[in-house]
């Protein structure tokens, strides 16, 4: 088992989970989600949070029994054994993580350009900032797990302080009429928005990748996952009330690339806009930081088990070569997709992997000691949310389904190809 000399404790793990979730959830996707569910987006966040809690319970139990830096990849190996199916799911999970990071990097660039004069807000600057933050955080992650955890504790503290302040002020000054159910869209749209809002929670899985760096993962891992999801769900709901209680839906959608900063304008003026925009930069950087740690652990696990060439698992400085490969892929993908497409592809992919993981958990539930009913509910909720997301995407952006199909096909082809390159077999952990 790979062990870091710099262990990760409960609060460090919680901070990493929060950092991974909040960057994508509020700063990158609030505007996109509001375009579907309007001022009822808080309901969608609650539903997405409930699904995440059940998934978190399942992954927490698996992680307690099979602590591994590979997280879900290890759980799939234990449930389904070795083979092309498990390997394809692992490659798909890695690709989904890279796509997610490209979304967050793009969000960082969107907020960064708000500080430029109107005449200088060119696409080239958005690309520059998006790529630059990836390069910087790859270098930071090369220093090892403790440095990642330390940065998360600092950034999460700043982020929570500003967002809590904005939430409290927004709720104090909110206009109840703006939150009236009469402004809500049809109920179907609220459920369809799960295609976006669940993606706001999917970052919690990065906590599973810290298991090998935890002194006592059997106790720390499950508690850290549940704590992170609950705190983030409360934060999302509070912010949704604050934003939509002060801005009409149309304004939120119009400023969807920097919706939270726009929401601060009527309460705090231009200073508030700038403070929230700076916080957005910190939050998205924090999310990239936490997710990069997970991505490099995924490549390590894949390389260790023979799914990627061994070069991916070679240490560079205090981290792994897979981190550098991931950084290059993230920058490339951030240039190819827009936010809504990335969110839909990422959300459906992750929900599919979660569904498969929970079903597999039922096969080995005697090993983990989890509740069969709760795991069944986790699988059912993940599957239902995935179906709803597919239905919505097929109506709103049918071309995304073709991209998603291609995404799965590429994962399968990559898996088969890498097996030939690596010339090794996957071996599950023996515990």
Regions found by a protein language model. Give the residues of each.
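Helix-loop-helix junctions that connect adjacent transmembrane segments
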Residues: 1-4, 42, 119-127, 153-277, ...
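Membrane-interface "cap" regions at the ends of multi-pass membrane proteins
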Residues: 1-31, 36-39, 53-57, 416-431
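Select transmembrane alpha-helical segments in multipass membrane proteins
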Residues: 7-17, 50, 81-96, 129-133, ...
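Membrane-interface loop-to-helix entry segments
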Residues: 112, 125-173, 184-187, 225-226, ...
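Alpha-helical transmembrane segments
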Residues: 308-314, 355-373
